[in-house]
A protein has these predicted regions:
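Basic amphipathic alpha-helical segments that dock to polyanions
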Residues: 49-56
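Short beta-strand "wing" residues that participate in macromolecule-binding interfaces
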Residues: 64
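Glycine-centered, phosphate/nucleic-acid-interacting loop/turn motifs that mediate DNA/RNA or nucleotide
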Residues: 60
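Short, solvent-exposed loop/turn elements at beta->coil junctions and helix N-caps
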Residues: 4, 67-68
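Basic, amphipathic "hinge/linker" alpha-helix immediately C-terminal to the N-terminal HTH DNA-binding motif
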Residues: 70-92
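N-terminal helix-turn-helix DNA-binding core of bacterial DNA-binding proteins
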Residues: 4-48
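Amphipathic alpha-helical dimerization/coiled-coil segments
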Residues: 86-112
Length: 112
């Protein structure tokens, strides 16, 4: 199933914050986790992820640091901040409201 580009963009921030709430991570691992969580429906690229990470970093919702990976190469690891956790909680409430509204509308539409 092809996902609507607007839906993918709208879900990017809460997805990234939720993944980082599980623990620190780096770009490629975040992309893999998105694919895993979506059952393969969301196939992100570097070009989709890094602008989101950079924006979240500018907003103070994510912090980044360089560290050596197991193979000795340096990777940039991202972690969610206290402000990011607050933003995640706010976005969760907003998405739950949208979900509830859509479910209600769709249930009525299916009975008409």
């Amino acid at each position: 199933m092809d996902m609507n580009k607007d839906l993918v963009a709208a879900s990017a921030t809460p997805l990234v914050l939720a993944i980082l709430a599980e623990g620190d991570s780096y770009g490629y691992a975040i992309i893999k986790r998105v694919a895993e969580l979506s059952g393969g429906h969301l196939q992100w690229t570097d070009g989709m992820l890094y602008p989101v990470l950079h924006r979240l970093e500018r907003q103070g919702h994510v912090a980044a640091k360089w560290a050596a990976a197991e193979n000795g190469r340096r990777r940039k690891y991202y972690r969610i901040t206290r402000e990011g956790r607050a933003q995640l909680a706010a976005q969760r409430q907003q998405w739950q409201a949208v979900d509830g509204t859509l479910r209600g509308i769709w249930m009525k539409a299916c009975t008409v």
